[in-house]
Regions:
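Extended, well-ordered protein cores
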Residues: 1-77, 86-196
Length: 196
């Protein structure tokens, strides 16, 4: 029989957040779901950060945020927040007051801090995190746009195909190709690219 469903997140404390209001299902349709542990994801990301730094290679995240509009921006935000952990901790109150959300990437963060009294300090701390962490793959080296600027800039099926064709390399900030550690936190893609 045809029916309808809604998606509600229920916290351990009992509070509920409606994620999707009622939507229809046709007779015979199946709905599936999964669970993501944010702490495990951040540990995985931290390991990738450390691996890229120790091997002196680029770090890159590959998602499908254009199609996976709920989960992948959250995953992207976890990557951004883990890489810039000290920045997000230090400026937590400022970011909260400006409605900065790591799920939207650095471009949105830069836009929201524009004109803020701490803008220069925040930008300096972001630059320090980039200088002290592993080198980050670039979307546009000429414009200084990193892999962490916008969640939809690196689409896994296109970006990984280009990386494989390029021998496992992406662009660094100097506009040259460099070996890369890829964060692919999606089992639909990760297993395939792990074997490649």
């Amino acid at each position: 029989n045809a029916t309808k469903y809604k998606i509600v997140f229920k916290e351990n404390a009992g509070a509920e957040t409606l994620l999707k209001d009622f939507a229809g299902l046709q007779a015979g349709e199946v709905i599936d779901s999964s669970v993501m542990n944010l702490n495990s994801l951040k540990s995985f990301v931290q390991e990738a950060i450390e691996e890229a730094k120790s091997k002196n290679v680029l770090l890159s995240a590959h998602l499908k945020a254009t199609m996976m509009k709920i989960s992948d921006p959250i995953v992207f935000g976890a990557i951004v927040e883990t890489f810039f952990k000290d920045v997000f901790t230090k400026y937590a109150e400022t970011f909260d007051s400006l409605d900065v959300n790591p799920n939207n990437g650095l471009a949105d963060l830069f836009d929201k801090i524009k004109g803020n009294a701490q803008e220069a300090e925040i930008k300096a701390d972001i630059e320090a995190a980039l200088a002290n962490g592993p080198r980050v793959a670039m979307v546009n080296s000429d414009k200084g746009i990193t892999n962490f600027h916008v969640p939809s800039d690196i689409i896994v099926d296109a970006s990984m195909a280009a990386l494989v064709r390029g021998g496992g390399k992406m662009w660094n900030k100097e506009g040259k190709e460099d070996d890369t550690v890829c964060i692919i936190p999606d089992r639909a893609y990760a297993g395939f690219y792990q074997s490649v």
